[in-house]
Regions:
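Karyopherin-beta/Importin-beta family HEAT-repeat alpha-solenoid scaffold
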Residues: 1-301
Length: 301
């Protein structure tokens, strides 16, 4: 990834289509913060609020918007409303400008999202963590199983980070959202690549041994999976932990159990039946019905 001493990506500048390097345009960040204050202040006039809103929308189309979005979103000292807007700058670039980016530019944007994902904190508001995870999904729909082949490994690495389970919750959001948007047929971006994306989803969720037994003559094609177990097995192992006696009263683990069951429900319609059986998904969903937490029971039913 190309960059300058300020950490600002310079990819594609020579072609006039990149994130230009002007030292980060230091005057823009305080103007963004001022505009956000005007929008959210109850004391702002309607005219001031409308002008500030128009300015914030206009910034999204600027070539440097993704860089400023990454800079602000990375700064945990910023107010959540500022960081949420910063993520929206990245979201706009991914959704509406992705096809115009060169390979190095797209890689830079993806690396920024990966860095934000790794650096989420338990104290970050849930809506910020989910917004970041949605950015991951948006990039996956556009490039996973094409020029982005190590996504599964990156998810596993996040899953295995020690300490808080915040990264596990992040991965669960990515898995559920990706499953929903690839297989429900309503997302137009995913629909354009549904063949590659659906095959990749089956690949990473299913234990490798089940794939080999179910399709002994299958052509592996593009390698997208990391390790042999697959996500159905990992989800089951964590669900057992969440419902175990040592974790049953932990609010974080209760919430995690709900998210795991939500992923189960999303993947059951398309997962290979033998994989569902091998990973004991149905048995674990039945076990959740006996949980002491009503929210877990409801999702598991």
């Amino acid at each position: 990834m190309n960059g300058s001493t300020s950490g600002h990506s310079t990819v594609g500048v020579e072609a006039g289509t990149g994130y230009q390097n002007d030292g980060g345009n230091t005057t823009l960040l305080p103007r963004i913060q001022q505009a956000l204050e005007l929008v959210h202040s109850p004391y702002s006039s309607n005219e001031s609020r409308q002008e500030a809103s128009a300015y914030l929308e206009e910034i999204k189309t600027d070539d440097e918007a993704p860089y400023h979005g990454f800079t602000l979103a990375s700064d945990h000292s910023q107010q959540p409303v500022v960081r949420h807007y910063a993520l929206s700058l990245l979201e706009f670039a991914i959704r509406y400008k992705w096809v115009g980016y060169s390979g190095p530019q797209a890689t830079t944007l993806r690396e920024w999202v990966l860095q934000l994902s790794k650096n989420i904190l338990p104290e970050d508001p849930l809506y910020l963590r989910n917004k970041t995870a949605q950015l991951w999904v948006e990039i996956a729909k556009r490039s996973w199983a094409d020029d982005w082949l190590d996504m599964d490994e990156l998810l596993v690495r996040l899953w295995e980070l020690q300490g808080s389970i915040v990264h596990k919750e992040f991965v669960l959001f990515v898995l559920e959202t990706l499953s929903d948007e690839v297989f429900n047929g309503e997302d137009t971006v995913a629909a354009l690549r549904v063949g590659a994306l659906s095959k990749a989803c089956v690949e990473i969720f299913t234990p490798a041994i089940v794939l080999s037994e179910a399709f002994p003559n299958r052509h592996v094609g593009t390698a997208v999976r990391f390790r042999e177990d697959g996500w159905l097995v990992r989800l089951g192992e964590l669900l057992d932990q969440c419902l175990g006696p040592d974790s049953a009263q932990n609010l974080q683990y209760k919430a995690c159990a709900v998210k795991i069951l939500a992923v189960y429900k999303s993947v059951m319609p398309w997962a290979i039946p033998r994989a569902i059986s091998s990973a004991s998904c149905v048995q674990r969903m039945c076990t959740s019905l006996a949980a002491s937490t009503v929210s877990v029971q409801l999702v598991g039913s």
